[in-house]
Amino acid sequence: MQNAKSRLQWVLDNAKEEELKDLVRLRLAGISLDEKKYDDAVRLLDTKHGESFDGLYADLKGDVLTSAGKVSEARAAYQVALDKLGKKGTYHSIVQMKLDALAEGK
């Protein structure tokens, strides 16, 4: 995992394309989630990014916050993700299921 992180960090430090940097931050945040480094993941996801990534960033932030036990913040993140994603499609349905699962676990 460390090798993947160092390679992704290199891309983040050297890439000129902002969309590529946005994607790399998303991947690094996922690794931080896997490592239970929730603050690092949130920091990456709170970084300014292209609008087209809003739904993806918010969804992963919801996952991070859920794992960190911050349920009300996770609900808010999932709601942002739903608002930013198209109303139809599988991904929208998955995020809706995550939000519904949090509501059931009150």
Predicted regions located by residue number:
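Alpha-helical adaptor scaffolds
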Residues: 1-56, 61
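Conserved positions within tetratricopeptide repeat
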Residues: 5, 22, 42, 75, ...
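"A position-specific structural signal for the A-helix of alpha-solenoid helical repeats
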Residues: 27, 56, 60, 67, ...
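TPR/TPR-like (Sel1-like) alpha-helical repeat modules
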Residues: 50, 71-89
